[in-house]
Amino acid sequence: MDLAPEPGWTPLTPFWEALGTRSYVSSDDDGDRIRVRYFSDDAGGTWARAVFGPGAEGPPGHVHGGALAALLDEAMGMAALSTGRVCVAGRIEVDFRSMVRLGEVVTVELALGDATPKKVPVRATLRRAGGTAACEATGLFVDIGTDGLGRAAEAAGL
């Protein structure tokens, strides 16, 4: 499956890779559950491309809703980190619009809202290959200011 960037997108190094740790969502080396790549665009936006494998199956031949929600959580977290803050999810809400087939490449578009000193709101839209929105999410990410995670975000260029 092609998880290549669009023109003008630059690959991002996830903070867990910079730390030498793993991600519950996207550290599936064999691609059985999910393969994810993160990117930034020329305007500073954050994007993700992903494909779900048989280990993410819910309804026959389709991705489990929890797997979709987990991807949106991680992707919104990457967008929140792009602000230079060390954030964790405080609230996430997901609306499912259509099912996603296993093996189908999807794109996650992320948008930051107006942040406060301690909170970063993020919106995400997961789109199928034709551009149809399969699910949308909003999240509120809380700045925890942890030094160790801050160094990881800096090392990853976020």
Region locations from a protein language model:
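A conserved, well-ordered hydrophobic junction motif at loop->secondary-structure transitions
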Residues: W47-L71
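Hydrophobic beta-strand-centered segment that forms part of the acyl-chain substrate-binding groove
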Residues: A70, E74-T107
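HotDog/MaoC-like acyl-thioester-processing domains
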Residues: M1-W16, V100-L102, G113-L158
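Non-catalytic linker/capping segments at the edges of enzyme domains
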Residues: M1-R49, G157-L158
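Conserved positions in beta-strands of structured domains
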Residues: F39, D95-R97, E109-G113, R127
